[in-house]
A protein has these predicted regions:
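Charge-rich amphipathic alpha-helical interaction elements
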Residues: 1-137
């Protein structure tokens, strides 16, 4: 194996590791997005339930309901902002993953081409070193 072939093989392994890391990061982002969207749905249900009229209430119950309504609305707004951010991050991570896959493919093609050239050079050298045979008629 030539030095260039070995370097290309090492580059390919390094790129494969990077690809794996980027894929793991993408899976983490998607998992976060799923959990956060579930939380957003639960908060929406709680806000809807809290906003229903429960008949006559005391002043402290109304204050409590208003306080919890504001708190849930703030949490939901935070969750929605985070979901929007995660959406952008997922798109970025997918783009980087695709670029990394393309780079790995290019390095793999260069390594296989180098291996073919090395094998062809070895065959050519063997043909040159082989003694000439006489053809009898």
């Amino acid at each position: 194996m030539s030095r260039k072939t070995r370097l290309l093989e090492l580059m390919m392994k390094r790129e494969t590791l990077r690809l794996r890391q980027k894929a793991d990061a993408l899976c983490g982002l998607v998992g976060d997005q799923t959990r956060l969207s579930d939380l957003d749905e639960k908060l929406a249900d709680l806000i809807l339930e809290n906003s229903k009229n429960h008949g006559s209430q005391t002043v402290s119950a109304l204050r409590s309901q208003a306080f919890y309504g504001r708190e849930m609305a703030e949490k939901r707004e935070f969750a929605q902002n985070r979901l929007e951010f995660l959406g952008r991050e997922i798109v970025t991570a997918q783009t980087q993953l695709a670029q990394s896959k393309q780079k790995e493919k290019m390095i793999e093609e260069r390594a296989s081409q180098e291996r073919r050239l090395l094998a062809q050079d070895a065959l050519d050298l063997a043909d040159r070193l082989r003694p000439a045979q006489k053809i009898e008629r």
